[in-house]
């Protein structure tokens, strides 16, 4: 028969496996947060243009960063419009586009838009339409290409970041300091996430091993139980004789 201690051990090992697998299963899908549009688009363009990891992300946060209480973080916001030094975060792409058109009807041309706050006055040919300007993929792609060109021209990522904002030294030096502070923070967070992921993978591997061990123990004990049952029946037949 299966001993109570062995049975408890098998149950515990199986439970550990189920718990580890549950950690790895994503929660039910939720509506995508607009900030995630910037995150995905920026990460893709960093890789495509050979930009140091998280640097373009840091610039996006410096440009259109918005504190999100639900995420407890400042993240780039795709529906951001800045004019006259004042940035406004809109709830939707359509609302942001209406705001830009309203500014343009008033004769305002110096307007920054989207995740990377591309300036419509200084980059008039960047996008085919205002709708494309607010497309996070197109916005990040143009900004990444512009930053890469600055890097190639200036031979320095430091200078590229400065000139992404302005060629004026008194303006670009504080901007560079701000971006690099954000960049250091983003790299620290990325390292912590990687460490946590590695730990989770080890826990899952350990749980899988324990689950297989539990299955073997259960199989062995089922065989032992069947053998014991056969012996009991054989003994009864012998006694009857």
Language model regions located:
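N-terminal secretory targeting signals
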Residues: 1-50, 181-241
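Catalytic glycan-binding domains that act on GlcNAc-containing polysaccharides
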Residues: 30-192
């Amino acid at each position: 028969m299966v001993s109570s201690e062995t049975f408890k051990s098998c149950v515990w090992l199986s439970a550990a496996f189920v718990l580890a697998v549950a950690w790895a299963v994503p929660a039910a899908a939720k509506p995508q947060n607009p900030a995630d549009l910037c995150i995905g688009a920026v990460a893709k363009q960093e890789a495509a243009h050979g930009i140091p990891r998280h640097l373009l992300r840091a610039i996006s946060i410096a440009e259109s960063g918005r504190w999100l209480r639900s995420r407890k973080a400042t993240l780039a916001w795709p529906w951001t419009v800045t004019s006259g030094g004042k940035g406004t975060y809109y709830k939707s792409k359509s609302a942001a586009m209406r705001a830009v058109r309203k500014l343009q009807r008033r004769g305002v041309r110096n307007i920054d838009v989207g995740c990377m706050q591309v300036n419509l006055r200084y980059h008039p040919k960047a996008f085919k339409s205002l709708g494309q300007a607010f497309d996070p993929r197109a916005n990040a792609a143009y900004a990444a290409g512009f930053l890469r060109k600055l890097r190639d021209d200036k031979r320095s990522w430091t200078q590229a970041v400065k000139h992404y904002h302005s060629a004026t030294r008194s303006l670009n030096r504080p901007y560079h300091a701000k971006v690099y502070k954000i960049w250091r923070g983003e790299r620290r967070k990325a390292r912590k996430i990687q460490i946590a992921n590695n730990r989770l993978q080890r826990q899952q591997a350990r749980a899988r091993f324990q689950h297989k061990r539990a299955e073997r123990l259960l199989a062995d004990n089922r065989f032992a139980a069947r053998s014991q049952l056969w012996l009991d029946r054989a003994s009864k037949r012998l006694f009857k004789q």
